[in-house]
């Protein structure tokens, strides 16, 4: 089952991005958005460690720039990270060029094939 269909131009612009998952696999994907946040991210990581759970953190590039220590903690503890744009901008409220530029700026810091658009 595919819940959300991204615009085809995004697939063309980002061919190495992960666009689909095997839907026959029985799995739960735990995700967090908008981090890293110094007051919250370490607490979440400790809780995930306690229960031996891995998650994916969709990071805002500007937050990664401001809080590199917390970003590195997520990576070092074996969690996946994904791009959530640099300034958490929603695509429908911005010109395509500006949106892609903002996404690419975040990608310079995050370097992931995972992307979640902000709502």
Regions inferred by a protein language model and the residue ranges of each:
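Internal catalytic-core helix/loop-beta-alpha segment
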Residues: 112-119
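Alpha-helix N-cap and loop-to-helix initiation/capping positions
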Residues: 94-101
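Active-site beta->alpha N-cap acidic-glycine motif
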Residues: 2-92, 105, 109-112
